[in-house]
Protein backbone atom coordinates (compact mmCIF):
# COMPACT_ATOMS: atom_id res chain seq x y z
CA UNK A 1 0.00 0.00 0.00
CA UNK A 2 3.04 2.21 -0.05
CA UNK A 3 2.80 2.89 3.69
CA UNK A 4 -0.14 2.65 6.06
CA UNK A 5 -2.79 5.35 6.00
CA UNK A 6 -3.91 4.42 9.47
CA UNK A 7 -3.48 7.22 12.00
CA UNK A 8 -3.76 5.85 15.56
CA UNK A 9 -3.82 9.38 16.92
CA UNK A 10 -6.79 10.28 14.76
CA UNK A 11 -8.64 7.16 15.86
CA UNK A 12 -8.06 7.99 19.51
CA UNK A 13 -8.90 11.69 19.25
CA UNK A 14 -11.63 13.52 21.07
CA UNK A 15 -15.04 11.85 20.98
CA UNK A 16 -17.90 10.76 23.15
CA UNK A 17 -16.60 9.90 26.58
CA UNK A 18 -16.40 6.17 27.21
CA UNK A 19 -16.28 5.13 23.57
CA UNK A 20 -13.30 3.17 22.25
CA UNK A 21 -11.37 4.36 19.18
CA UNK A 22 -12.97 1.70 16.98
CA UNK A 23 -16.45 2.60 18.25
CA UNK A 24 -15.89 6.23 17.28
CA UNK A 25 -14.47 5.23 13.91
CA UNK A 26 -17.44 2.95 13.20
CA UNK A 27 -19.89 5.86 13.38
CA UNK A 28 -18.73 7.23 10.03
CA UNK A 29 -18.37 3.89 8.26
CA UNK A 30 -20.71 2.18 5.79
CA UNK A 31 -22.44 -1.05 6.83
CA UNK A 32 -21.88 -3.61 4.04
CA UNK A 33 -22.96 -6.77 5.89
CA UNK A 34 -26.41 -5.59 6.95
CA UNK A 35 -25.81 -6.18 10.66
CA UNK A 36 -22.89 -3.77 11.17
CA UNK A 37 -20.55 -6.73 11.41
CA UNK A 38 -18.48 -5.45 8.48
CA UNK A 39 -18.03 -1.68 8.21
CA UNK A 40 -16.21 0.15 5.43
CA UNK A 41 -14.55 3.52 4.91
CA UNK A 42 -13.20 4.26 1.41
CA UNK A 43 -9.84 6.03 1.48
CA UNK A 44 -9.25 6.04 -2.29
CA UNK A 45 -11.88 5.31 -4.91
CA UNK A 46 -11.31 2.53 -7.42
CA UNK A 47 -12.44 2.16 -11.03
CA UNK A 48 -14.45 -0.32 -13.06
CA UNK A 49 -16.67 -3.13 -11.81
CA UNK A 50 -16.71 -4.56 -8.30
CA UNK A 51 -15.00 -7.88 -7.59
CA UNK A 52 -17.02 -10.87 -8.79
CA UNK A 53 -17.63 -14.02 -6.70
CA UNK A 54 -14.99 -16.72 -7.35
CA UNK A 55 -12.56 -14.11 -8.69
CA UNK A 56 -8.85 -14.27 -7.97
CA UNK A 57 -7.65 -11.08 -6.31
CA UNK A 58 -4.30 -9.34 -5.96
CA UNK A 59 -4.38 -7.34 -2.73
CA UNK A 60 -2.17 -5.69 -0.16
CA UNK A 61 -3.47 -5.68 3.38
CA UNK A 62 -2.58 -4.94 6.99
CA UNK A 63 -4.60 -6.00 10.04
CA UNK A 64 -4.59 -4.12 13.36
CA UNK A 65 -5.88 -4.75 16.86
CA UNK A 66 -7.38 -1.83 18.73
CA UNK A 67 -4.81 0.38 20.52
CA UNK A 68 -2.00 -1.26 18.51
CA UNK A 69 0.09 0.75 16.04
CA UNK A 70 1.85 -2.22 14.43
CA UNK A 71 -0.10 -4.72 12.32
CA UNK A 72 -0.54 -8.26 13.59
CA UNK A 73 -0.83 -9.46 9.99
CA UNK A 74 0.37 -7.88 6.74
CA UNK A 75 1.56 -8.84 3.28
CA UNK A 76 2.82 -5.35 2.39
CA UNK A 77 6.44 -6.43 2.81
CA UNK A 78 6.13 -8.68 -0.24
CA UNK A 79 7.27 -7.24 -3.55
CA UNK A 80 4.58 -9.19 -5.39
CA UNK A 81 1.62 -10.35 -3.29
CA UNK A 82 0.20 -13.80 -3.91
CA UNK A 83 -2.91 -14.13 -6.06
CA UNK A 84 -5.77 -15.35 -3.83
CA UNK A 85 -9.00 -16.98 -4.95
CA UNK A 86 -12.20 -16.00 -3.20
CA UNK A 87 -13.86 -18.92 -1.48
CA UNK A 88 -10.59 -20.84 -1.19
CA UNK A 89 -7.59 -18.80 -0.04
CA UNK A 90 -9.21 -16.16 2.19
CA UNK A 91 -10.02 -17.34 5.71
CA UNK A 92 -11.76 -14.24 7.10
CA UNK A 93 -15.42 -13.94 6.16
CA UNK A 94 -15.27 -10.20 6.70
CA UNK A 95 -12.38 -9.79 4.26
CA UNK A 96 -14.24 -11.78 1.62
CA UNK A 97 -17.35 -9.60 1.99
CA UNK A 98 -15.19 -6.49 1.97
CA UNK A 99 -13.39 -7.48 -1.22
CA UNK A 100 -16.70 -8.10 -3.00
CA UNK A 101 -17.50 -4.42 -2.45
CA UNK A 102 -14.22 -3.14 -3.91
CA UNK A 103 -13.09 -1.93 -7.33
CA UNK A 104 -9.66 -2.08 -8.97
CA UNK A 105 -7.26 0.45 -7.45
CA UNK A 106 -9.46 1.06 -4.40
CA UNK A 107 -7.97 1.52 -0.94
CA UNK A 108 -10.36 1.04 1.97
CA UNK A 109 -10.44 0.60 5.73
CA UNK A 110 -12.67 -2.09 7.27
CA UNK A 111 -13.79 -3.00 10.77
CA UNK A 112 -14.63 -6.67 11.27
CA UNK A 113 -16.66 -7.72 14.32
CA UNK A 114 -15.65 -11.05 15.92
CA UNK A 115 -18.29 -13.05 14.01
CA UNK A 116 -16.66 -11.92 10.73
CA UNK A 117 -13.07 -12.24 11.94
CA UNK A 118 -11.62 -14.54 14.60
CA UNK A 119 -14.77 -15.41 16.56
CA UNK A 120 -15.41 -15.51 20.28
CA UNK A 121 -12.23 -17.48 21.00
CA UNK A 122 -9.85 -15.35 18.96
CA UNK A 123 -6.55 -16.85 17.86
CA UNK A 124 -4.25 -17.05 20.91
CA UNK A 125 -1.75 -15.71 21.61
CA UNK A 126 -1.98 -13.18 18.77
CA UNK A 127 -5.71 -12.39 18.68
CA UNK A 128 -7.62 -12.04 21.98
CA UNK A 129 -11.19 -13.38 22.39
CA UNK A 130 -14.07 -11.34 20.91
CA UNK A 131 -11.68 -8.98 19.10
CA UNK A 132 -12.87 -6.40 16.61
CA UNK A 133 -10.10 -5.92 14.07
CA UNK A 134 -9.29 -3.20 11.57
CA UNK A 135 -7.98 -4.07 8.11
CA UNK A 136 -6.64 -1.73 5.47
CA UNK A 137 -6.96 -3.33 2.05
CA UNK A 138 -5.76 -2.16 -1.36
CA UNK A 139 -7.22 -4.00 -4.34
CA UNK A 140 -4.47 -3.94 -6.95
CA UNK A 141 -6.28 -6.09 -9.50
CA UNK A 142 -8.63 -9.03 -9.86
CA UNK A 143 -9.27 -11.70 -12.47
CA UNK A 144 -12.64 -13.32 -12.95
CA UNK A 145 -11.62 -16.96 -13.08
CA UNK A 146 -15.09 -18.47 -12.56
CA UNK A 147 -16.09 -18.05 -16.20
CA UNK A 148 -12.76 -19.43 -17.41
CA UNK A 149 -12.81 -22.41 -15.03
CA UNK A 150 -16.36 -23.39 -16.03
CA UNK A 151 -15.61 -23.06 -19.73
CA UNK A 152 -12.41 -25.11 -19.55
CA UNK A 153 -14.31 -27.88 -17.75
CA UNK A 154 -16.58 -28.35 -20.79
CA UNK A 155 -15.87 -30.89 -23.51
CA UNK A 156 -14.51 -29.78 -26.88
CA UNK A 157 -17.93 -30.40 -28.44
CA UNK A 158 -19.64 -28.21 -25.83
CA UNK A 159 -17.09 -25.42 -26.26
CA UNK A 160 -17.77 -25.42 -30.01
CA UNK A 161 -21.33 -24.28 -29.33
CA UNK A 162 -20.19 -20.94 -27.90
CA UNK A 163 -19.55 -17.84 -30.03
CA UNK A 164 -15.99 -16.84 -30.85
CA UNK A 165 -16.06 -13.79 -28.57
CA UNK A 166 -16.61 -16.09 -25.58
CA UNK A 167 -13.60 -18.23 -26.54
CA UNK A 168 -11.43 -15.15 -27.02
CA UNK A 169 -12.47 -13.78 -23.63
CA UNK A 170 -11.69 -17.03 -21.80
CA UNK A 171 -8.36 -17.41 -23.62
CA UNK A 172 -7.45 -13.83 -22.69
CA UNK A 173 -8.23 -14.58 -19.04
CA UNK A 174 -5.99 -17.66 -19.12
CA UNK A 175 -3.21 -15.59 -20.67
CA UNK A 176 -3.62 -12.89 -18.01
CA UNK A 177 -3.26 -15.55 -15.33
CA UNK A 178 -0.14 -16.78 -17.06
CA UNK A 179 1.30 -13.27 -17.16
CA UNK A 180 0.69 -12.80 -13.45
CA UNK A 181 2.34 -16.14 -12.62
CA UNK A 182 5.25 -15.24 -14.92
CA UNK A 183 5.80 -11.99 -13.00
CA UNK A 184 5.99 -14.08 -9.83
CA UNK A 185 8.70 -16.24 -11.46
CA UNK A 186 6.34 -19.23 -11.37
CA UNK A 187 7.30 -20.21 -14.88
CA UNK A 188 5.96 -23.79 -14.89
CA UNK A 189 2.55 -22.60 -13.70
CA UNK A 190 2.58 -19.78 -16.26
CA UNK A 191 3.37 -22.28 -19.02
CA UNK A 192 0.29 -24.34 -18.06
CA UNK A 193 -1.97 -21.28 -18.34
CA UNK A 194 -0.48 -20.25 -21.69
CA UNK A 195 -0.95 -23.75 -23.08
CA UNK A 196 -4.58 -23.77 -21.93
CA UNK A 197 -5.12 -20.50 -23.77
CA UNK A 198 -3.49 -21.85 -26.93
CA UNK A 199 -5.54 -25.06 -26.80
CA UNK A 200 -8.77 -23.06 -26.54
CA UNK A 201 -7.82 -20.90 -29.52
CA UNK A 202 -6.76 -23.86 -31.66
CA UNK A 203 -9.76 -25.95 -30.68
CA UNK A 204 -12.22 -23.36 -31.97
CA UNK A 205 -12.43 -23.59 -35.76
CA UNK A 206 -12.56 -20.01 -36.97
CA UNK A 207 -14.12 -19.01 -40.26
CA UNK A 208 -12.21 -16.91 -42.78
CA UNK A 209 -14.06 -13.85 -41.51
CA UNK A 210 -13.08 -14.65 -37.91
CA UNK A 211 -9.42 -15.39 -38.62
CA UNK A 212 -8.37 -11.76 -38.23
CA UNK A 213 -9.66 -11.90 -34.63
CA UNK A 214 -8.07 -15.23 -33.72
CA UNK A 215 -4.57 -14.75 -35.15
CA UNK A 216 -3.59 -11.76 -32.96
CA UNK A 217 -4.69 -13.69 -29.85
CA UNK A 218 -2.73 -16.78 -30.92
CA UNK A 219 0.33 -14.65 -31.69
CA UNK A 220 0.40 -13.18 -28.18
CA UNK A 221 0.19 -16.62 -26.56
CA UNK A 222 2.92 -18.04 -28.81
CA UNK A 223 5.22 -15.17 -27.84
CA UNK A 224 4.47 -15.83 -24.18
CA UNK A 225 5.23 -19.53 -24.58
CA UNK A 226 8.50 -18.82 -26.36
CA UNK A 227 9.58 -16.49 -23.56
CA UNK A 228 8.55 -18.81 -20.73
CA UNK A 229 10.45 -21.73 -22.29
CA UNK A 230 13.56 -19.54 -22.42
CA UNK A 231 13.08 -18.93 -18.69
CA UNK A 232 12.73 -22.68 -18.18
CA UNK A 233 16.05 -23.20 -20.03
CA UNK A 234 14.39 -25.15 -22.84
CA UNK A 235 15.58 -23.27 -25.94
CA UNK A 236 14.40 -25.89 -28.43
CA UNK A 237 10.79 -25.40 -27.30
CA UNK A 238 11.28 -21.62 -27.22
CA UNK A 239 12.46 -21.78 -30.84
CA UNK A 240 9.50 -23.95 -31.82
CA UNK A 241 6.91 -21.49 -30.50
CA UNK A 242 8.85 -18.50 -31.80
CA UNK A 243 8.85 -19.96 -35.31
CA UNK A 244 5.11 -20.63 -35.04
CA UNK A 245 4.65 -16.95 -34.18
CA UNK A 246 6.63 -16.00 -37.29
CA UNK A 247 4.20 -18.02 -39.43
CA UNK A 248 1.55 -15.51 -38.35
CA UNK A 249 3.75 -12.41 -38.54
CA UNK A 250 7.09 -12.98 -40.24
CA UNK A 251 8.35 -9.51 -39.31
CA UNK A 252 7.41 -9.63 -35.64
CA UNK A 253 10.44 -8.28 -33.77
CA UNK A 254 9.68 -10.13 -30.52
CA UNK A 255 9.34 -13.46 -32.29
CA UNK A 256 12.58 -12.89 -34.22
CA UNK A 257 14.33 -11.88 -31.00
CA UNK A 258 13.09 -14.96 -29.08
CA UNK A 259 14.20 -17.24 -31.92
CA UNK A 260 17.61 -15.55 -31.93
CA UNK A 261 17.96 -16.02 -28.17
CA UNK A 262 16.98 -19.68 -28.47
CA UNK A 263 19.45 -20.36 -31.29
CA UNK A 264 22.23 -18.69 -29.32
CA UNK A 265 21.55 -21.02 -26.38
CA UNK A 266 21.53 -23.95 -28.81
CA UNK A 267 24.92 -22.71 -30.16
CA UNK A 268 23.40 -22.38 -33.63
CA UNK A 269 25.27 -19.15 -34.22
CA UNK A 270 24.50 -18.60 -37.91
CA UNK A 271 20.76 -19.00 -37.34
CA UNK A 272 20.95 -16.82 -34.24
CA UNK A 273 22.61 -14.07 -36.26
CA UNK A 274 19.99 -14.32 -39.01
CA UNK A 275 17.09 -13.97 -36.56
CA UNK A 276 18.69 -11.16 -34.57
CA UNK A 277 19.70 -9.13 -37.63
CA UNK A 278 16.12 -9.40 -38.90
CA UNK A 279 14.84 -8.30 -35.49
CA UNK A 280 17.25 -5.36 -35.50
CA UNK A 281 15.99 -4.36 -38.94
CA UNK A 282 12.47 -4.09 -37.50
CA UNK A 283 13.58 -2.26 -34.34
CA UNK A 284 17.03 -0.67 -34.88
CA UNK A 285 17.08 1.14 -31.52
CA UNK A 286 16.00 -1.80 -29.36
CA UNK A 287 18.69 -2.16 -26.68
CA UNK A 288 17.84 -5.80 -25.92
CA UNK A 289 18.27 -6.82 -29.54
CA UNK A 290 21.52 -4.86 -29.94
CA UNK A 291 22.92 -6.29 -26.71
CA UNK A 292 22.03 -9.81 -27.82
CA UNK A 293 23.94 -9.26 -31.05
CA UNK A 294 26.98 -8.18 -29.03
CA UNK A 295 26.57 -11.27 -26.86
CA UNK A 296 26.37 -13.43 -29.98
CA UNK A 297 29.56 -11.85 -31.35
CA UNK A 298 31.41 -12.59 -28.11
CA UNK A 299 30.17 -16.19 -27.97
CA UNK A 300 31.07 -16.74 -31.61
CA UNK A 301 34.62 -15.43 -31.11
CA UNK A 302 35.07 -17.78 -28.16
CA UNK A 303 33.71 -20.64 -30.25
CA UNK A 304 36.10 -19.89 -33.15
CA UNK A 305 39.05 -19.64 -30.75
CA UNK A 306 38.20 -23.02 -29.23
CA UNK A 307 37.83 -24.60 -32.65
CA UNK A 308 41.16 -23.15 -33.78
CA UNK A 309 42.91 -24.45 -30.66
CA UNK A 310 41.38 -27.91 -31.10
CA UNK A 311 42.48 -28.06 -34.75
CA UNK A 312 45.96 -26.88 -33.80
CA UNK A 313 46.30 -29.73 -31.33
CA UNK A 314 44.88 -32.31 -33.73
CA UNK A 315 47.25 -31.45 -36.56
CA UNK A 316 50.35 -30.43 -34.61
CA UNK A 317 53.59 -32.27 -35.68
CA UNK A 318 54.18 -35.49 -33.75
CA UNK A 319 57.51 -34.26 -32.45
CA UNK A 320 55.90 -31.31 -30.74
CA UNK A 321 53.65 -33.53 -28.62
CA UNK A 322 54.70 -34.66 -25.17
CA UNK A 323 55.85 -38.26 -24.97
CA UNK A 324 53.50 -40.38 -22.88
CA UNK A 325 56.16 -42.84 -21.83
CA UNK A 326 59.10 -40.45 -21.59
CA UNK A 327 61.90 -40.71 -19.01
Swiss-Prot record:
Coiled coil: none annotated. Its main location: cytoplasm. Residues 54-143 form the PPIase FKBP-type domain. GO terms for molecular function: Hsp90 protein binding; identical protein binding. This is Inactive peptidyl-prolyl cis-trans isomerase FKBP6. Gene3D superfamilies: 3.10.50.40, Tetratricopeptide repeat domain. Co-chaperone required during spermatogenesis to repress transposable elements and prevent their mobilization, which is essential for the germline integrity. Acts via the piRNA metabolic process, which mediates the repression of transposable elements during meiosis by forming complexes composed of piRNAs and Piwi proteins and govern the methylation and subsequent repression of transposons. Acts as a co-chaperone via its interaction with HSP90 and is required for the piRNA amplification process, the secondary piRNA biogenesis. One of its GO terms (biological process) is meiotic cell cycle. Keywords: Chromosome, Cytoplasm, Differentiation, Meiosis, Nucleus, Repeat, RNA-mediated gene silencing, Spermatogenesis, TPR repeat. InterPro entries: FKBP6/shu, PPIase_dom_sf, PPIase_FKBP_dom, TPR-like_helical_dom_sf, TPR_rpt. The lineage of its organism: Eukaryota, Metazoa, Chordata, Craniata, Vertebrata. It is found in: Cytoplasm, Cytosol; Nucleus; Chromosome. SMART domains: TPR. GO terms for cellular component: cytoplasm; cytosol; fibrillar center; intercellular bridge; microtubule cytoskeleton; nucleoplasm; synaptonemal complex. Interacts with HSP72/HSPA2 and CLTC. Interacts with GAPDH; leading to inhibit GAPDH catalytic activity. Interacts (via TPR repeats) with HSP90. Disruption phenotype: Males mice are sterile and aspermic due to abnormal pachytene spermatocytes, characterized by the appearance of unusual inclusion bodies and dense compacted nuclei. Spermatocytes fail to proceed beyond the pachytene stage due to abnormal pairing and misalignments between homologous chromosomes, non-homologous partner switches and autosynapsis of X chromosome cores in meiotic spermatocytes. No other abnormalities are detected in any tissues of males. Females mice are fertile. TPR repeats lie at residues 171-204, 219-252, 253-286. Belongs to the FKBP6 family. Testis-specific.
